[in-house]
């Protein structure tokens, strides 16, 4: 290994291991479905001329590229790469560097004990969103979707961290009065009328939301002359439990302790949120990662899938459409 910046083994995935061990409800593997073997490492950041020498030739380095034993990663004169190994170790390669992936478990020169496979699995599950599987349906939205005049955006098909979530919607007539309704297991929990806004944070004075419980919400017009009233889709969400929230806090803090690039930290945070089905939070982190690498089509594909999974089909179609336009 030459001109390689000092190997740093951070506590990035110590807490992630705890996350996965607790069997989060967002597990993505279907029963009876064989999963391909996980790679030994993955490129989580790739800037400039990065190449991977492997059996069969040379592969251009790219975000999310899986790495196997024998692969040699090389960076150009003004390039850098960040690699996450299956034992939780993290390596940053500076310009003009090279490193080879070795062994069934990469044994990096570090005094820190390996973290295990679970945290790596969290990141791998997130990166699987780049797969073209399912993108055909997103592409179909590009030409076949109908614009909803009143649409509940967030939270939708997701879990939330706070018992005071912020509800966000789209409406073509912002001057018209709306009514937002929150439903619990026993029916209507809270209602409120508003005008001229497209979001509302659940107030302290409203009936409290219970961690672990599932809720739904809608917005609709109140004008008696509009018959029938215009009503949004019903959006569902679940409040995460106190125990899970505590574990997540530790996981996110550990990621912040590392010296990974800002883009990589956003990707890692998004991976944790995705593992717990906190899709809105995963979307926000992926958006921030993409803002730092706007031409990263892999991140664009992941974001499109996250939009689709969280019910934001218009944004999914727009994002995927931009990918198709570049092809």
Spans of features found by a protein language model:
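Glycine- and acidic-residue-biased ligand/ion/polar-headgroup-sensing regions
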Residues: 32-57, 74-81, 86-89, 95-134
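Long, contiguous interaction/recruitment modules in multidomain scaffold/adaptor proteins
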Residues: 138-260
